């Protein structure tokens, strides 16, 4: 798609990663702060409330949610991790937060990698501003 814009990738090694949908949305801005574009992408496994018993066969355990943008000075990214199937166990020890990794590149140059902890019950909403030059 755009080789000179931003690429955002979200992954997790958590075995229950399949229980979550991931949505990425961002506004792309020029150096003066004017929005010049918008991009969105989703990795949807199931409808919210599906309460699946196991990972669907057509969903890779190590799936990646990815978003590519047009070239721009900076973006404001919104990342949503949304549970569609809640944990089967109510014990706190069995439902500790799990990790995701967010990798952000611009024109194929890695800008940053962030690790985030996600609550198994509520998921997460993350907002990030990312400059193309940092």
Name these PLM-found stretches.
Residues 15-17, 84-92:
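Short acidic/polar inter-strand loop motif in beta-rich domains
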Residues 33-87:
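Short, intrinsically disordered low-complexity segments
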Residues 21-23, 92-101:
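Short coil-to-beta strand junction motifs in C2/discoidin
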Residues 62-69, 123-133:
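Exposed aromatic-hydrophobic patches
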Residues 1-36:
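Short, surface-exposed binding/anchoring microloops in extracellular/periplasmic proteins
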Residues 80-85, 97, 113-115:
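Extracellular or exported targeting regions of proteins
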Residues 114-126:
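Short, solvent-exposed aromatic-acidic interface loops
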